[in-house]
């Protein structure tokens, strides 16, 4: 099943291609909400739409993105300081006596320091980086939909929570970022045929068991191993991925627009 993709997220390019309107109010609401819930995720490619704001709404969104980055940077800098202290304490302890705990603390702190420095460098970089357009489940992605007779581009979460279902469905059904074709008239019947959208994808990634990829049975005592397949058309080609979407509402929670990509087994895994 597709678990990650590199997605076209240039909003004005999408608007021109599909003759669609950008749903600015929903984009603004999303970036405002992210200030309160820093766990909401987007790819850097989506944020880049607001690097050089030209309208009032773009300037407001740009300000929210900058405020979010400052909040995240402050948190990571605090965590970085803690790990540096942990490393220094471990190294002092090792000078006095070799212990497993001190050696583990040194190793873990060193790894985390490198990780936080890399994160902060990426956060502060103004350069376009490889993978800026890559999304994963629960990322918010621009999707082209038809609503009220209009084509709209709207940010939606890449894991669909169907309207009327409890929020606990996110954990109960973690695979709902994909909508299998053989279940469209079952689990997805509430939105299939009525609430469709399109995601523009440049390449995508599949998780596959290694023995399945090699078209063989597991050997005795062999444990399944995961293999990540990258489907990357050459020459480069934009693929239109059909999606199902839903607008979830609750009296005590923010509205949620979310979607699932319609998928099937990749061709190399099909048995017929």
Predicted regions located by residue number:
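Short linear sequence motif anchored by a di-proline
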Residues: 1-272
């Amino acid at each position: 099943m597709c678990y990650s993709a590199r997605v076209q997220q240039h909003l004005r390019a999408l608007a021109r291609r599909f003759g669609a309107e950008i749903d600015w109010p929903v984009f603004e609401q999303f970036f405002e909400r992210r200030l309160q819930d820093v766990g909401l995720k987007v790819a850097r490619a989506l944020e880049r739409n607001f690097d050089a704001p030209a309208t009032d709404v773009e300037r407001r969104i740009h300000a929210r993105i900058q405020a979010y980055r400052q909040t995240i940077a402050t948190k990571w800098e605090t965590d970085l300081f803690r790990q540096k202290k942990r490393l220094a304490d471990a190294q002092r302890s090792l000078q006095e006596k070799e212990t497993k705990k001190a050696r583990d603390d040194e190793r873990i702190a060193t790894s985390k320091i490198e990780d936080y420095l890399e994160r902060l460098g990426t956060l502060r970089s103004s350069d376009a980086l490889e993978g800026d357009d890559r999304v994963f489940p629960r990322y918010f992605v621009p999707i082209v939909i038809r609503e009220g007779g209009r084509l709209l581009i709207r940010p939606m979460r890449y894991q669909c929570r169907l309207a009327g279902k409890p929020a606990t469905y996110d954990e109960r059904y973690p695979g709902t970022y994909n909508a299998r074709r053989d279940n469209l008239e079952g689990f997805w019947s509430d939105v299939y045929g009525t609430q469709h959208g399109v995601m523009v994808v440049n390449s995508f990634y599949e998780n596959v068991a290694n023995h399945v990829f090699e078209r063989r049975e597991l050997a005795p005592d062999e444990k399944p191993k995961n293999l990540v397949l990258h489907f990357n058309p050459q020459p480069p080609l934009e693929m239109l991925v059909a999606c199902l979407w839903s607008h979830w509402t609750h009296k005590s929670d923010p509205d949620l627009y979310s979607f699932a990509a319609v998928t099937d087994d990749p061709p190399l895994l099909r048995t017929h």
